[in-house]
């Protein structure tokens, strides 16, 4: 059965609107990836360069606090750097989606890899947040003392470095949702 001219025009308009929506979402995807790169890279650098030394009795004996004294903070640096590297490598695919809005396979690959990065960054950030909480508050039952009264600069830096990762986590969620939205619109 032949379609009427009105139906053909309606389908063409729908296809054009769908293409414009995909392109707009792809541009937003690129911008969100750039913001997430900055957030995760800043978190990794801030945590990875955190250390503080305090004198003990004399100036020759010093106590030193570094991020790599705690394996959880090391995991945080690795996960943030890995997520940042992934986001940088995914930018060309995001540009491809702006130019070719019909690319489906690469969107599926990005959704899967975005989910992997989301879960690893969430796990590392949550574990680091627990350690930062213990550093600030301690745990009297386990006889762990809060050391942030002595190492205040160290604690401020490790607390601040969590901000970037907790900004990147919702960005990853939005990236996944936007890619799924584009895939659902045919």
Swiss-Prot record:
Q: So what does this one do?
A: Regulates membrane-cell wall junctions and localized cell wall deposition. Required for establishment of the Casparian strip membrane domain (CSD) and the subsequent formation of Casparian strips, a cell wall modification of the root endodermis that determines an apoplastic barrier between the intraorganismal apoplasm and the extraorganismal apoplasm and prevents lateral diffusion.
Q: What is this protein called?
A: Casparian strip membrane protein 1
Compartmental location: Cell membrane
For this protein, the record's Pfam families field holds:
CASP_dom
Q: Which GO terms describe its cellular component?
A: plasma membrane
Q: Which organism is it from?
A: Lotus japonicus
Q: Name one GO biological process term.
A: cell wall organization
Keywords for this entry? Cell membrane, Cell wall biogenesis/degradation, Membrane, Transmembrane, Transmembrane helix
Give a yes or no for keyword Transmembrane in this entry: yes
